[in-house]
């Protein structure tokens, strides 16, 4: 089964893969940030947003993974095997959790559209040969807040204001009072 945890948010695993693994903060830093900014919403029984829900799930998943790692660490006798398991969890699963946490914390902090625009900008920047790209990569916090991601398809037709009609010099008849009471 090929499940992309970013699909419903307009992103993809491939889009996040353009960011190097050392781009993402440590899980501890991401958990501290999520807790500092969104603790009340994350602990609330109310539904806040799909990003809050996804963040809750990623945090719970990481907690369960740490429980498993602790169990493996205390029950696996062979130090080499234990090191392999710990390394695999930290490198592979840790990166996926760091990406998930970063994505959802960033979407809650900067807005989904801004994060998507950043991912696209970074993807374009990293794929451009070094000789033709600016020396510095785009930075999420410096993107303009009014970034607009244009959707494909026809743009909405703009209505031009109609010209004002000339008022006649003759007095107008009053409409009945019953019309004014309607909303």
From Swiss-Prot:
<feature type="compositionally biased region" description="Basic residues">
    <location>
        <begin position="149"/>
        <end position="176"/>
    </location>
</feature>
<feature type="modified residue" description="Phosphoserine; by host">
    <location>
        <position position="170"/>
    </location>
</feature>
<keyword id="KW-0945">Host-virus interaction</keyword>
<feature type="short sequence motif" description="Bipartite nuclear localization signal">
    <location>
        <begin position="158"/>
        <end position="175"/>
    </location>
</feature>
<dbReference type="GO" id="GO:0005198">
    <property type="term" value="F:structural molecule activity"/>
</dbReference>
<keyword id="KW-1176">Cytoplasmic inwards viral transport</keyword>
<feature type="repeat" description="2">
    <location>
        <begin position="162"/>
        <end position="169"/>
    </location>
</feature>
<keyword id="KW-1163">Viral penetration into host nucleus</keyword>
<keyword id="KW-0597">Phosphoprotein</keyword>
<feature type="modified residue" description="Phosphoserine; by host">
    <location>
        <position position="155"/>
    </location>
</feature>
<dbReference type="GO" id="GO:0030430">
    <property type="term" value="C:host cell cytoplasm"/>
</dbReference>
<keyword id="KW-1144">T=4 icosahedral capsid protein</keyword>
<keyword id="KW-0238">DNA-binding</keyword>
<dbReference type="GO" id="GO:0003677">
    <property type="term" value="F:DNA binding"/>
</dbReference>
<dbReference type="InterPro" id="IPR002006">
    <property type="entry name" value="Hepatitis_core"/>
</dbReference>
<feature type="region of interest" description="Disordered">
    <location>
        <begin position="136"/>
        <end position="183"/>
    </location>
</feature>
<keyword id="KW-0167">Capsid protein</keyword>
<comment type="similarity">
    <text>Belongs to the orthohepadnavirus core antigen family.</text>
</comment>
<keyword id="KW-1160">Virus entry into host cell</keyword>
<keyword id="KW-0946">Virion</keyword>
<feature type="modified residue" description="Phosphoserine; by host">
    <location>
        <position position="162"/>
    </location>
</feature>
<dbReference type="Pfam" id="PF00906">
    <property type="entry name" value="Hepatitis_core"/>
</dbReference>
<protein>
    <recommendedName>
        <fullName>Capsid protein</fullName>
    </recommendedName>
</protein>
<dbReference type="GO" id="GO:0003723">
    <property type="term" value="F:RNA binding"/>
</dbReference>
<keyword id="KW-1177">Microtubular inwards viral transport</keyword>
<dbReference type="GO" id="GO:0046718">
    <property type="term" value="P:symbiont entry into host cell"/>
</dbReference>
<keyword id="KW-1035">Host cytoplasm</keyword>
<dbReference type="GO" id="GO:0039619">
    <property type="term" value="C:T=4 icosahedral viral capsid"/>
</dbReference>
<feature type="repeat" description="3">
    <location>
        <begin position="170"/>
        <end position="177"/>
    </location>
</feature>
<dbReference type="GO" id="GO:0075732">
    <property type="term" value="P:viral penetration into host nucleus"/>
</dbReference>
<feature type="region of interest" description="RNA binding">
    <location>
        <begin position="177"/>
        <end position="183"/>
    </location>
</feature>
<dbReference type="InterPro" id="IPR036459">
    <property type="entry name" value="Viral_capsid_core_dom_sf_HBV"/>
</dbReference>
<feature type="region of interest" description="3 X 8 AA repeats of S-P-R-R-R-[PR]-S-Q">
    <location>
        <begin position="155"/>
        <end position="177"/>
    </location>
</feature>
<feature type="repeat" description="1; half-length">
    <location>
        <begin position="155"/>
        <end position="161"/>
    </location>
</feature>
<keyword id="KW-0694">RNA-binding</keyword>
<dbReference type="GO" id="GO:0043657">
    <property type="term" value="C:host cell"/>
</dbReference>
<dbReference type="GO" id="GO:0075521">
    <property type="term" value="P:microtubule-dependent intracellular transport of viral material towards nucleus"/>
</dbReference>
<comment type="function">
    <text>Self assembles to form an icosahedral capsid. Most capsids appear to be large particles with an icosahedral symmetry of T=4 and consist of 240 copies of capsid protein, though a fraction forms smaller T=3 particles consisting of 180 capsid proteins. Entering capsids are transported along microtubules to the nucleus. Phosphorylation of the capsid is thought to induce exposure of nuclear localization signal in the C-terminal portion of the capsid protein that allows binding to the nuclear pore complex via the importin (karyopherin-) alpha and beta.</text>
</comment>
<keyword id="KW-0677">Repeat</keyword>
<comment type="subunit">
    <text>Homodimerizes, then multimerizes. Interacts with cytosol exposed regions of viral L glycoprotein present in the reticulum-to-Golgi compartment. Interacts with human FLNB. Phosphorylated form interacts with host importin alpha; this interaction depends on the exposure of the NLS, which itself depends upon genome maturation and/or phosphorylation of the capsid protein. Interacts with host NUP153.</text>
</comment>
